[in-house]
Amino acid sequence: MTIKPSLTIDDIARELGVSKTTVSRAISGKGRISAATRERVQAYIEEHNYKPNASAKSLAESKTYNLAIVLPRDFIKLDIPFVRTAMSSIVDEAHTLGYNVMLCLDDDTDSTPLMRTLDYRKVDGVILTRTVEDDHMVEMLTKRGIPFATLGSLPLKYAGAAVVEADHDHIGGCCAFAKAVLTGSDAPIALLGNDLNYIVNQNRLSGFRKACQELVIPLNRTPIRMGINDLEGCREAVEELLAQGVRRFLCMDEDVCVRTMTVLRDNGLSIPGDAQVASFADTDQIRNAQPPVSALSFDSAELARAACREFIHALNDDSYDPKPLLGYKVRLRQSMI
């Protein structure tokens, strides 16, 4: 059989029913691929006298089939459930698609581990596990032309910088959950949150405000307190609100929620009898609290898998979704009456 001079990796992949990545690995001899598949590709190449052009060969040989996960150093200290779930899900998804994963710790003053990894070209791309308003990591990766994906949406000033931005519908979810909580009573309810430098907190706040606007609820019924980073800050905010007669609290994350419940009980208030709480984040700690806390549930594992999967598809020039947007579930439990 005479082969056309224009035979490409795409053609070979299509004829054999495998991905372009698999063909590239068979050509380069790099990456995870079964011996049987490698032999099948090589046999096809020999039969059709395929000679990869310089560009195709260079592309195949330059791939490392490694990804780097960038984890903020303070996340390790805080032992955040989202991080554990996301990391294990990324590793599993990457392994399924033939990639290995390297972990790089980062903080605002020292990006040495990742810089060294990039300098030695040990990875094909980077996955960032958080998005913030002013992100030195996004700026560095963009400047160096390194492809990256994010767990979470980027701020508008970085629009288009990431290859993939995977996120949950925080605005829609928080709006729906806030409506469910707000319509249950005419009593005021306070929103308590952490650092607004995190894009997820900005989106959750937007969802709450959208719910208040759509329900035409006056501002004095929904006081907002942000920047609650520790127990003492939470105590100050909650006790101030208690003095104003507020007995219902909607918390942006599980840490703020647990601290709020601690402060309420320290003040002699029972939940849900004397005060009520709800959370924009659902974790084991929230579900197993006494009483179980009403919460907005997001699938962190699926978010991480989607980000990794679409990113790898993009790196291999396959079709991909640049902005996967995942849904949510409203969980009403005993902490709200």
Regions found by a protein language model. Name each.
Residues 1-65:
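N-terminal helix-turn-helix DNA-binding module of bacterial transcription factors
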Residues 129-175, 255, 281-293:
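Flexible loop/hinge segments that line or gate small-molecule binding clefts
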Residues 48-114:
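Amphipathic helical "hinge" segments at domain boundaries
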Residues 123-129, 188-193, 224, 244-255, ...:
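Periplasmic-binding protein-like
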